[in-house]
From Swiss-Prot:
Keywords assigned by UniProt, alphabetized: Cytoplasm, GTP-binding, Hydrolase, Nucleotide-binding, Ribonucleoprotein, RNA-binding, Signal recognition particle
Protein name: Signal recognition particle protein
Organism per entry: Buchnera aphidicola subsp. Schizaphis graminum (strain Sg)
SMART domains per UniProt: AAA, SRP54, SRP54_N
Enzyme Commission number(s): 3.6.5.4
Enzyme class: hydrolase
């Protein structure tokens, strides 16, 4: 969803990155290119106008942070405005109420409403350890009730079986009573969608909302609908008390205008985004992380977070110690980390995250599959202990011997050594000035083909 905007903004901001100072003249072309990028992303015109005005005002005559170049400062201003457009901070679910807390899920037909409800139930169950019940009030769409039942069963969440001969109002009342009787912490109510908004639909949802008194009413919108999604959200917000928005299908090729516009237009926070079809692919919406993603900065941070969830804490601590001791990190340590990566199970998931980053996508250490890591392992195993501890001694004849012993080419050995050296440089930056300083200087550390 954000890839096209990332590409366009990267092209626009590249022109200003090395400027000695920010002036109205030298940012004019960049501002124009940023505006075009936002238009192509289908961002609402009123949002673009405000965005460009704020960036221009803050950039010209802005006091530059001494640790940043003017170009970096401009990118920081753009990032901050992206965050402001999307809502500044993450808005968590409000579950602080006497059980059962009720979440009402609304939206048009075909936006992924039922699937999103189950994803949300799964996420809440795993994070908060709640006892959860789901129910469908959609008596109009064929197999809607059965769909929710099947999906709920897949994630081992209880389902209240309703009947198409009942009214949505009666189903709601009965499900609430059942949730109270069986001491459920949370009840998620799926409502009927329509192909378009109409008075009958809104009246029904309003009645369900008045009866159930939900602590959250979440509007589900499809990112692929573009400006139509914005208009639909506006109409729902005018008719219902919406507490938040969930944007689905953000893994698609849809333009990113919905995410950048919907908060400004509706005044309602984006609470979650759907990142794929599978039932675990739902993420809390963090404006700062999305801004980093749009500007191409988030892959490393996101990968570290995912790795922390995959490995045990002792492994994380050991990795962190080595990571901070840049001078002590050698090819033996690197080999251990390669083995851990291979043992994580879902290696392709991590590689995919890196492959989306323009800076890192050409890195031979992040090959296409496990075979690449096997090849790197073979190169390191063909080295002597001394060579692994002190890679600097590996010159012409040693490289030929290592390539021959590992069944690879000298170029492969050169690439491994070059990229290992880059990793050590990054670690030294972290050791000296912390991660923040390393990120600010990352463009000076990495070669263009890294």
């Amino acid at each position: 969803m954000f890839n096209n905007l990332t590409e366009r903004l990267s092209q626009s901001l590249r022109k200003i990155i090395n400027k000695g100072r920010l002036t109205e003249e030298n940012i004019k072309d960049t501002i124009r290119e940023v505006r075009k990028a936002l238009l192509e992303a289908d961002v609402t015109l009123s949002v673009i106008k405000k965005f460009i005005q704020n960036v221009s005002k803050k950039a010209i005559g802005h006091e530059i942070n001494k640790s940043l170049t003017p170009g970096q400062e401009f990118i920081k201003i753009v990032k901050n405005e992206l965050i402001l457009s999307m809502g500044e901070k993450n808005h968590d679910l409000n579950l602080s109420i006497q059980p059962p807390a009720i979440i009402l899920v609304v939206g048009l037909q075909g936006v992924g409403k039922t699937t999103t409800l189950v994803k949300l139930a799964k996420w809440i169950k795993e994070k908060y350890k709640k006892k959860i019940l789901t129910v469908s009030t959609d008596i109009y769409r064929a197999a809607a009730i059965k769909q929710l039942q099947i999906l709920s069963d897949q994630v081992k969440i209880d389902f209240y079986l309703s009947d198409t001969t009942q009214t949505p109002i009666n189903i709601t009342k009965e499900a609430i009573e059942h949730a109270k009787l069986k001491l459920y912490d949370l009840l998620l109510i799926d409502t009927a969608g329509r192909l378009h908004i109409n008075t009958e639909m809104m009246n029904e949802i309003n009645t369900i909302q008045n009866i159930s008194k939900p602590i959250e009413t979440l509007l589900i919108v499809d990112s692929m609908m573009g400006q139509d999604a914005i208009n639909i959200a506006k109409k729902f917000s005018a008719s219902l008390s919406i507490s938040g928005i969930v944007i689905t299908k953000t893994d698609s090729d849809a333009r990113s205008g919905v995410a950048l516009s919907i908060r400004h237009i509706t005044g309602k926070p984006i609470k979650f985004i759907g990142t794929g079809e599978k039932l675990h692919q739902l993420e809390p919406f963090h404006p700062e992380r999305i801004a980093d993603r749009i500007l191409g900065m988030n892959q490393v941070i996101s990968l570290i977070k995912d790795i922390e969830e995959k490995v045990n804490q002792s492994q994380v601590k050991n990795l962190t110690k080595k990571f901070r001791k840049g001078d002590d990190f050698n090819l033996n340590d690197f080999l251990i980390q390669l083995k851990e990566m291979k043992n994580m199970g879902n290696l392709n998931y991590f590689i995919e995250k890196f492959s989306k980053n323009k800076i890192l996508s050409n890195n031979p250490l992040l090959g296409e599959n496990k075979n690449t890591l096997n090849r790197i392992e073979a190169i390191i195993y063909s080295m002597t202990h001394k060579e692994r501890m002190h890679p600097i001694i590996i010159k012409g004849s040693r490289k030929r011997r290592i390539a021959l012993g590992s069944g690879t080419k000298i170029q492969d050995v050169n690439k491994l050594l070059k990229n290992f050296d880059n990793i050590k440089k990054i670690m030294k930056k972290i050791k000296k000035g912390g991660i923040g300083k390393m990120i600010r200087n990352i463009s000076n550390i990495l070669p263009k083909n890294f």
